[in-house]
């Protein structure tokens, strides 16, 4: 009997929150948990640690200050067309190559995307000469895309990214609450300058969050440098 190829969960960088692979360790201290809830509440209410609320101002901001990549009109969830398992979201969308490659490219995917271990080599089409892994829906098992390992210069930028077939997904739009086929959705590619600005803002948000957690940790942890009597 032929051995079945092993499959393993897709690998990706640690996300800030949600069910994306990696995840962060939960803080066991109650004060840390409370601060986390307060920060999440700020985001939901339209403020952020970068805005007046994060600087300790008494008056809230006049208008919503959600980061540009979290604006409702730009947020969408990509689901398996067959079982509706969540595969990815617009926050981690890199490129829309539906017309040229028939795929939407993501920098991260959820744990519902399973990467098949054996490498395949393309012998025809756009993946000719490329080495890649197939991606499957972990819920219903249908193939949903591929993950490039090595390829020619034209697709070199896609290495390490997750290419999900647009005809195997549906898209849930958060602003309108509508569900449309991913292949029919007009995804606007964000200019590079805007992506860089978003990345800088994410770095600052993460830095402020780490500073807050370090302050809490220093308050609840006894000073280990003092010698014991």
UniProtKB/Swiss-Prot annotation:
Pfam families: Yippee-Mis18. One of its GO terms (cellular component) is Cajal body. The keyword GTP-binding does not apply. PROSITE patterns: MIS18 (PS51793). It comes from the Eukaryota. The keyword Nuclease does not apply. It is found in: Nucleus; Chromosome; Chromosome, Centromere. The modification Phosphoserine is found at residues 48, 225. Required for recruitment of CENPA to centromeres and normal chromosome segregation during mitosis. Belongs to the mis18 family. This is Protein Mis18-beta. It comes from Homo sapiens (Human). The gene is OIP5.
């Amino acid at each position: 009997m032929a051995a079945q190829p092993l499959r393993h969960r897709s690998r990706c960088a640690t996300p800030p929150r949600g069910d994306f692979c990696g995840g962060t360790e939960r803080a066991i201290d109650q004060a840390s948990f409370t601060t986390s809830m307060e920060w999440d509440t700020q985001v939901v209410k339209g403020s952020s640690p970068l805005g007046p609320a994060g600087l300790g101002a008494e008056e809230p901001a006049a208008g919503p200050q959600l980061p540009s990549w979290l604006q409702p009109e730009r947020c969408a969830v990509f689901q398996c067309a067959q079982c509706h398992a969540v595969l990815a979201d617009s926050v981690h969308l890199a490129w829309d190559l539906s017309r040229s490659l028939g795929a939407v490219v993501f920098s991260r995917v959820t744990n519902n995307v399973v990467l098949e271990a054996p490498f395949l080599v393309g012998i025809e089409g756009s993946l000719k000469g490329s080495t890649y892994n197939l991606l499957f829906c972990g819920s219903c098992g249908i193939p949903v895309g591929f993950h490039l390992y090595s390829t020619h210069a034209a697709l070199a930028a896609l290495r390490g990214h997750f290419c999900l077939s647009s005809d195997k997904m549906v898209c849930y739009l958060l602003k309108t609450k509508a569900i449309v086929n991913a292949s029919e959705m007009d995804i606007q590619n964000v200019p590079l300058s805007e992506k860089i600005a978003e990345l800088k803002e994410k770095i600052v948000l993460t830095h402020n969050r780490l500073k807050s957690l370090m302050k809490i940790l220093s308050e609840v942890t006894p000073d280990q440098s003092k010698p014991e009597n």
